[in-house]
Amino acid sequence: MRKFIPLLFLICSISFAQLKVGNVDLNFGDIIESKDGNIVKIAGKNNNVIYALARSKKKFFLQTFDASTKNFKNSSLLKFDKLNGSKLQIEDLAIVEGKVFLMLSYYDKKAKTYNFLAKEIQGNEIVNTTNVLSVDVENKKKKGTFVFTPSFDEVNYLVAHVGVNDKKKVLKYSISLLDSNLKSVVKDSYEAVFDKKNRQYFDFSDVQVNEHGDVLIATTESYRDKKKKTNINNITIHAYLASKSYEKQVTSISLSGKRALNCSLMETKDNTLHAIGFYSDLKKNGKAEFTVEGIYDVTFDYTTGTVNKETFNAFTYDVKKQLIGERRAKKGKNLKPFYKNISFVERENGGVIVLSEYLFVVEGKSTGFGPLAITPITYNSNEIIVTALKKDGTLDWSNVIPKEQQVTVSELGFSLGLAGASGAVTVTAGLYFPLTVLGNGPEYLSAIPIYHNGALTVIVNDDPKNIGITTMDDVKKVRNIYKMIPVAFSFDETTGKLSRTDPTEFEKKQIAVRPSTKYRKDSNSYIIYGGSKKGNCLGELILNE
């Protein structure tokens, strides 16, 4: 009997560590022995070591793993003294051209500056600290927001700050593109007069750095023209091209009769840039409807700033029928503005596939006081609208991934408030779920899209009760993360017909993937993180040829 128990445990461990969903393999390493929280960010691989950031309540840890086996190596508490009387807030963990950096921010009360720091890590040690961007702000409450992202090839790292000075009535964004030595390749700032009284709205919508080192920023703006009694709605692309010594190039597109609710950038072949987002119609009085009519796509050559085409694709009857019912769809009713574009995929034909997910967050009533207050937060992550656009931006096909996911977490001393917003200024560029809310459940929501060899596959977590379900009318809501199983939805590239694949074998308490905690290795593979009541594991998701 003493020999039998270890053998049985080994067999269970092997079955727990591997799962197959159609042609998708999910291979996990050993259960992580460390109890230092849950991984909230996978930065990537360097010298056969995977670097990750873990969180437990308000504490953060640097964790390392063997890149070959995905097995746990080490965990170190990230603890820092106050700087100029202010606490340091961990923002990101990134690998830039083989160097590992921990990114932090802090407010300097005396200097009235908001600062972004980069701490270089070698092994498990911090070897130096650099202030990469410092911005003058009004006060701590109006310090604005930092947005940050590595370049497509991970050779550069971009830091941007967006804020409003109410006294001067000025909106300002500042950017700094860094190399691996934390030297600024390009640094710039932009100011505009901003007056809330004129119903002026501004959104810092997206920021990207492509493989050429070009910085591309999308903003949307809406304001009321009292003389013309209408709303002015603009999309503006700010481009800093490496081939032109980062001389700024601005392209503004004015939308007639429509309002852009958001905007994301997607670069495809032949220097074509797609500015894609949701739009709503304008009422007769010039105000925007509180609904989403469809998806727009503005295509242009970003190297010259030439606009090629503006296209507005209303959601089809078949899509709306699944989401709001046949009766309302026949009446031409539109969708509520609770959808967020979570992923953009370049098609082999030069078009773009857009994944738009329903996300509604409810903040409950807090119990307790101050930093000891506990706030219940419910995340509702439901259906995903899949829209395939042609190269010119017109609609090719669309469909709906049926799912209903709900997670409720209790956060200590946390409030959603107006994070990322200042008055009528919003910042939608950035993380889907902030690091401060990951680790307790929201990371199990959403999806992992894989586009390989001209075919789209989307991995989501679902309840075993929904096995075989492909329509919204029949889907059952999944609330328990420990009952979730990974399933795959695939689409016919020509017609958009949806197929569902469920795992043929799974345990009752099967490990579930955390889509918000992943790192893309190739077009068909991700480093992933999963968990169940048995424990958590790092692994790899591979879409087989």
Feature locations, PLM:
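A short helix->beta-strand "capping" segment at the edge of beta-propeller domains
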Residues: 18-37, 74-75, 130-131, 324-333, ...
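Loop/turn-rich, solvent-exposed surfaces of beta-rich toroidal or solenoidal domains
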Residues: 36-37, 219, 277, 295, ...
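Long, internal scaffold/assembly segments composed of regular secondary structure
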Residues: 208-212, 216-217, 228-358, 362-369
